[in-house]
């Protein structure tokens, strides 16, 4: 009788990853994920930038629509007005008791600067307090020319007073708001000036009647704003009609980080809109 023998079947071993190989794979995955996150973040920022630009344009259209309906530009809102303009009805002067309002409080003379009066002009959407926000959740800001040339005529308000606008006509030009390419060499005024270097002037003092501005992704009140963004911030009590507008720059740029988005209404656009509506001869 033959004895049976147990036959052993060899199973080939499956090759596994060594610790070094796993580490390499993890590094590659982390690199790819980091690149994807960076790309996603950049795409998100670009989308929000585009959305904000559209919001600024819509706000501009709403301001001009209000102007056609009322024969004047709206005054700025302030941080306590729930999105309504702050204006002395009898004189057309922007601000309570004749003082201009800005984001941080009152400004006497110069430019009437504050927040977009979204409720007054019928702009949507607004937040629960009545303020228009950019795509990053910052309140849209709004400045308007106060000083004119010639400077005669009473009451003093022109662009925010329908009766004066009609009486003075298109011969009256703004003489304070100015947009510059850099804060270097500027003079606050009023009237404001971009300085002696001609290429620093984006507009002159007789061009801009209103400015609508988003403080961008880094918002208002950042810990270390660049000099260009400081200029657009106009801290409490500043009597400063100069604004800066240029392409975004990083923190290491000469005048620091800048991501504000600035849009303005020219006096030519204002007058042509009113003429087309039959409100000016």
Residue ranges and their predicted role:
Residues 13-43:
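N-terminal single-pass transmembrane signal-anchor helix
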Residues 1-12:
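N-terminal secretory signal peptides that target proteins for export/translocation
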Residues 42-281:
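N-terminal pilin/flagellin-like segments and related low-complexity appendage regions
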């Amino acid at each position: 009788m033959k004895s049976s023998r147990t036959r052993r079947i060899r199973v080939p071993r499956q090759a596994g990853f060594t610790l070094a190989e796993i580490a390499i794979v993890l590094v590659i995955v982390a690199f790819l994920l980091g690149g994807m996150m960076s790309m996603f973040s950049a795409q998100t920022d670009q989308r929000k930038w585009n959305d904000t630009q559209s919001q600024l344009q819509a706000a501009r259209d709403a301001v001009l629509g209000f102007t056609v309906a009322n024969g004047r530009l709206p005054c700025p809102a302030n941080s306590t007005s729930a999105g309504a303009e702050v204006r002395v009805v009898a004189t057309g002067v922007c601000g309570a008791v004749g003082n201009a309002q800005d984001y941080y409080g009152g400004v006497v003379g110069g430019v009437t600067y504050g927040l977009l009066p979204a409720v007054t002009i019928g702009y949507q959407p607004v937040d629960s307090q009545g303020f228009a926000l950019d795509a990053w959740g910052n309140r849209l800001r709004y400045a308007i020319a106060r000083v004119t040339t010639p400077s005669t005529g009473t009451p003093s308000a022109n662009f925010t007073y329908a009766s004066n606008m009609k009486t003075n006509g298109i011969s009256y030009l703004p003489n304070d708001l100015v947009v510059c390419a850099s804060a270097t060499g500027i003079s606050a005024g009023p009237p404001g000036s971009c300085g002696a270097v001609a290429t620093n002037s984006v507009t002159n003092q007789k061009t801009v009647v209103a400015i609508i501005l988003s403080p961008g992704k880094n918002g208002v009140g950042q810990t270390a704003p660049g000099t260009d963004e400081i200029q657009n911030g106009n801290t409490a009590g500043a009597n400063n009609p100069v604004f800066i507008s240029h392409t975004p720059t990083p923190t290491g740029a000469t005048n620091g980080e800048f991501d504000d988005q600035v849009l303005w209404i020219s006096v030519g656009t204002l007058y042509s809109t009113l003429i087309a509506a039959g409100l000016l001869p």
